Amino acid sequence: MACENRFFINMEELRNIFASSCVEAVARKVGCSTGEIYRRMKRVGLIAGFILPGYEVLHTQSREHVTEDVLGALLIWERKMGIMA
C-alpha cells in the first residue's frame, strides 16, 4: 500500500534538480539573485558544459565543495570569454 503514493524521478530530472540547486547555492554565496546567476551560467554554457556532464562526480561531494567548484568554474569561463561579471 505504501508504494501506491510514491513517484519516481528519472536521471534527467535528477540532474536538472541538481543544476538548479547549484544555481541557488552560488547565488546565495555571492549574494545575488538566482536569475542573475542562471543568466551568467547560461551565457557561458556552464550548466550544459560543466554541471550536467559533471553530475556523477559533483553530486557525491559536499555542498560547500560543489558551490566553490561551480563558482570557480563560472569565473574562469567568464574570464576566458572576456565577460566581466
Model-identified regions with their sequence ranges:
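Amphipathic alpha-helical interface segments used for dimerization/assembly
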Residues: 27-30, 41, 74
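Membrane-interacting alpha-helical segments
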Residues: 1-7
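Amphipathic alpha-helical interaction segments
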Residues: 29-33, 48, 77, 81
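N-terminal acidic leader/helix
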Residues: 7-36
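Alpha-helix initiation and N-capping motif
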Residues: 34, 44, 63-67
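Long, compositionally biased
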Residues: 54-85
